[in-house]
C-alpha cells in the first residue's frame, strides 16, 4: 500500500487505473465469479493454527538482514533476499518454487526488471485454488516485511497439511513501482485459472497501524478495483464482489474473534467525533455513502482503494481478502491524506504525521519503541484467520 497517495492523485487527475492503464476486465458472469462462499463455520469445524512466533522470527530477520529490497536496485538486498527466500522455502521442504521474471514500466515511466516467486501447495480438489500474495520489494519493516513474514510462517507451518484447495503463495515484486508484479501475474492467468480461483488474500503492512482491518469488494459492474475519478460531490459507487470479505468476517467470528463490520461502523465517527477504541478485533474501512469520510472520500466500506496487490486480481473478477493494519479515523498532519486509511496511527506527532510506510520511521526499532508488543498482537489475529481461510472448504 506504499504508493497509495501518488496513485490517488494520478487517478483523480487522469481517471486512469494504476500505472496509467485500465485493465480489461471480463463481464460479470458465473464463470468468473466463484460460487457463494458458504459453508458451516463453527469453532469445532475450523482448523486453528497460530504461527505468530515464527512470523515474529521472520520479521526480525528480514528487517535486520534485508532492510532494502527495492526492485531493480543492484545496491539493495533485493536479489540477496530472493536467494534467501528460496533457501528458506527449500528448508521447509519446498524445492519446486517457480520464478516469474518480468520487465514493465513503473508509474514513474522507468523500466523495472522484477521477479515473482511462486510456491504451489497442491490441494485435494480438482483445479480449485487460493492465492496468497505478499510483496517483498521495498525498504520497510511494516511495509512489507510484515506481510512476507506471515506468508512465510504460514507456508512453513502448513507444510504437512492436506488442504482441500491448491494454495499458491506468491511473493510479488515491483509493488512500490505500481503493482507491477501482481498485475503481471494476474494478467498471465488463464481463463480456467481465473474461474477456479476461490479468492486472493493480500497481506500488506500488518504491524504498525492502530487497527487490524479486513477489506473486500470492488466498485461498479466493470470491476474497478478502487481507482475512481469522482466529480465534486459524486458518491463512491457501492462495492460489489464482497464475497471474500464476508467469508473472512464470518470465519473470524467462528474462530471467536470480534469483528466490527460495516453496519456497526457506519456513522460511528459522525456520532462520536472519534473512532472506536482499538482492541483485539477486526475492523474495516468505516466510511459509507450514508456517512462518508469528513474529507477525501475515496472508498466505500468494506472495500478500499486499489493501491495494493489485490487490485490486479479484483479487475479479473476474483474476490479478494485484504489484511492491513492502519487507522481510517486518523486525520494526521497532512490534510490531503486525512481519513484515507494512509495514516497509520491517531497520534500525528509519531512517525511522519502519523505515517510510517514510505518514511524513515518504517523500521523494527521504531515499531518496538513506539508500539511494544503490537506486531505480536496483530499476528495473533491475522495468523489464525489466514490459516483457517486456507484450510476450510469454502463452497
Q: Over which residues does each language-model region extend?
A:
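Alpha-helical metal-binding/catalytic segments enriched in His/Glu/Asp
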Residues: 119, 128-179, 386
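A non-catalytic alpha/beta surface segment that caps or lines the substrate-entry region
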Residues: 57, 61-122
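His/Asp/Glu-rich mid-to-C-terminal helical/loop segments that flank catalytic regions of hydrolases
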Residues: 330-395
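C-terminal motif of bacterial Sec signal peptides marking the signal peptidase cleavage site
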Residues: 14-18
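Second-shell loop/turn segments in exported
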Residues: 41-50, 63-79, 104-108, 135-144, ...
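Extracytoplasmic/secreted proteins, especially bacterial periplasmic and envelope-associated proteins
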Residues: 50, 54-57, 61, 76-91, ...
Amino acid at each position: 500500500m506504499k504508493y497509495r497517495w501518488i496513485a490517488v492523485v494520478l487517478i483523480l487527475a487522469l481517471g486512469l487505473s494504476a500505472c496509467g492503464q485500465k485493465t480489461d476486465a471480463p463481464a460479470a458472469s458465473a464463470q468468473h465469479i466463484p460460487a457463494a462462499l458458504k459453508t458451516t463455520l463453527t469453532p469445532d469445524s475450523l482448523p486453528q493454527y497460530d504461527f505468530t512466533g515464527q512470523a515474529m522470527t521472520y520479521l526480525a530477520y528480514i528487517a535486520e538482514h534485508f532492510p532494502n529490497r527495492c526492485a531493480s536496485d543492484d545496491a539493495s538486498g533485493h536479489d540477496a533476499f530472493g536467494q534467501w527466500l528460496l533457501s528458506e522455502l527449500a528448508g521447509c521442504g519446498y524445492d519446486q518454487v517457480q520464478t516469474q521474471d518480468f520487465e514493465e514500466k513503473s508509474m514513474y515511466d522507468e523500466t523495472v526488471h522484477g521477479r515473482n516467486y511462486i510456491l504451489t501447495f497442491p490441494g485435494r480438489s480438482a483445479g480449485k485454488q487460493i492465492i496468497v500474495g505478499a510483496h517483498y520489494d521495498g525498504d520497510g519493516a511494516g511495509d512489507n516485511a510484515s506481510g512476507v513474514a506471515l506468508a512465510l510462517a504460514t507456508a512453513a507451518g502448513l507444510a504437512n497439511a492436506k488442504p482441500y484447495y491448491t494454495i499458491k503463495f506468491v511473493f510479488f515484486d515491483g509493488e512500490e513501482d505500481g503493482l507491477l508484479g501482481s498485475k503481471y501475474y494476474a494478467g498471465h492467468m488463464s481463463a480456467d485459472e481465473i474461474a477456479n480461483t476461490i479468492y486472493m488474500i493480500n497481506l500488506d503492512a500488518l504491524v504498525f497501524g492502530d487497527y487490524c482491518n479486513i477489506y473486500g469488494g470492488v466498485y461498479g459492474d466493470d470491476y474497478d478495483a478502487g481507482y475512481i475519478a469522482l466529480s465534486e460531490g459524486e458518491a463512491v459507487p457501492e462495492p460489489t464482489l464482497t464475497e471474500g470479505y464476508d467469508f473472512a468476517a464470518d470465519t473470524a467470528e467462528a474462530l471467536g474473534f470480534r469483528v466490527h463490520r460495516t453496519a456497526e461502523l457506519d456513522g460511528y465517527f459522525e456520532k462520536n467525533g472519534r473512532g472506536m477504541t482499538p482492541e483485539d478485533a477486526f475492523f474495516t474501512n468505516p466510511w459509507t455513502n450514508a456517512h462518508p469520510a469528513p474529507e477525501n472520500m475515496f472508498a466505500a466500506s468494506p472495500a478500499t482503494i486499489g493501491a495494493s496487490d489485490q487490485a490486479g486480481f479484483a479487475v479479473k473478477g476474483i474476490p479478494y481478502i485484504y489484511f492491513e493494519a492502519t487507522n481510517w479515523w486518523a486525520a494526521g498532519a497532512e490534510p490531503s491524506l486525512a481519513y484515507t486509511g494512509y495514516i497509520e496511527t491517531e497520534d500525528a506527532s509519531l512517525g511522519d504525521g502519523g505515517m510510517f510506510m514510505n518514511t524513515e520511521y518504517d523500521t523494527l526499532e521504531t515499531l518496538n519503541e513506539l508500539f511494544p508488543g503490537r506486531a505480536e498482537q496483530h499476528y495473533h489475529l491475522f495468523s489464525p484467520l489466514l490459516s483457517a481461510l486456507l484450510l476450510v472448504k469454502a463452497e
